[in-house]
Design a protein with these regions (language model features):
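N-terminal Rossmann-like NAD(P)+-binding domain of SDR-like oxidoreductases, especially those catalyzing
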Residues: 1-172
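Short, flexible, glycine-rich and Lys/Arg-enriched loop motifs at helix boundaries
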Residues: 38, 170-191, 201-222
Length: 330
């Protein structure tokens, strides 16, 4: 297959590109490098620097790269906090960018897309594990834009026959098993890399926000999914569409939750480092428990997480962070 990966220099995008190429596919990457890293792009991928909001730039890729079978769309801003203080940035980049992409896809006859969505579309869950049919009531602008992007695909399919798969995933984590690429955000907002930065000494401590939740140890419980397993799900979704599969939405998670304290303790075990912990008050909007039901993805796509053990997930992340303490920076 020949696949165009938008946002292919980012964390999940770059791992998906690696997985695609390791599976023998031809890959074209389009990224503006605002948050992505050129060093994360697989050397065998064809790279174009460009902004999705610029129609001529994405048109140019479709015109130069004949025979693209499908698009995988990761290109979006994704910081929850920033989305609340600068919502217009998220409407511009996430929604406007996707609108321009769809215009170009329709014009060039590209009719299959796999979309990187999020558990943030659900907001405060009514139950766990969360099913794809559960209500979507986002509690932040990031989740709202992702929900709106899903609706754009729905209506564009009705008008133009474009088929899509939307993958709503939970807490992405870990790194490529080789240690060549991994997670490098600035600022870092995800739990596991923050814990590992504290283990490295590049961060003074890890804060636990809330110790009085109705959970076994009082801290929030989340569903952690290895980035390589997410990458594999995107490939399976493309193959599903290539075989004529109908448009659909799938959750991606391990279906097992770990508390913040459990993740910290496992990181101490893996790294053999002392990690300073500071207990703080709850953050508003943090649900006590978020766990996905991924039964639908397993049944329909044939997806099965390969790295479903928390210790293994943290080991791959630690391999990356311990050899790249400054991420992709020299």
């Amino acid at each position: 297959m020949k696949i165009l990966v938008l946002g292919g220099a980012g964390y999940i995008g770059s791992h998906t590109v690696y997985r695609l190429i390791e599976s023998g596919n031809e890959v074209v990457v389009f990224d503006n490098l605002e948050t992505g890293h050129i060093e994360a792009v697989h050397p065998k991928a064809k790279f174009y620097k460009g902004d999705l909001r610029n129609r001529s730039e994405i048109d140019s890729v479709f015109e130069k790269e004949k025979g693209i079978d499908a698009v995988i769309h990761f290109a979006a801003n994704s910081l929850v906090g920033e989305s609340m203080t600068n919502p217009l940035k998220y409407y511009d980049n996430n929604l406007n960018g996707t609108e321009v992409l769809l215009q170009s896809m329709v014009a060039h006859g590209i009719d299959k897309i796999v979309f990187s969505s999020t558990a943030a579309t659900y907001g405060e869950p009514e139950r766990t594990p969360i099913l794809e049919t559960d209500p979507t009531n986002p509690t932040n602008c990031y989740g709202e834009t992702k929900k709106s992007m899903e609706r754009m695909f729905y209506w564009v399919e009705k008008a133009h026959g474009l088929r899509y798969v939307s993958l709503r995933y939970f807490n992405a984590c870990g790194a490529h098993i080789s240690g060549k690429i991994g997670e490098a955000h600035n600022p870092e907002t995800h739990l596991i890399p923050i814990i590992l930065q504290a283990a490295q000494g590049t961060r003074d401590h890890i804060s636990i926000f809330g110790t009085d939740y109705p959970t076994s140890d009082g801290t929030c419980i989340r569903d952690y999914i290895h980035v390589t397993d997410l990458a594999q799900a995107h490939i399976l979704a493309v193959e599903y569409l290539m075989k004529g599969g109908k448009s659909d939405i799938f959750n991606l998670g391990n279906g097992v939750g770990f508390s913040v304290r459990e993740v910290i303790e496992k990181a101490k075990e893996v790294t053999q480092k002392d990690i300073k912990v500071v207990e703080e008050s709850r953050r508003s909007g943090d649900p006590a428990v978020l766990i996905a039901s991924s039964d639908k993805a397993k049944t329909v796509l044939g997806w099965k997480p390969e790295y479903d053990d928390l210790g293994t997930i943290i080991k791959t992340a630690w391999k990356w962070h311990s050899t790249h303490p400054n991420g992709y920076s020299k």
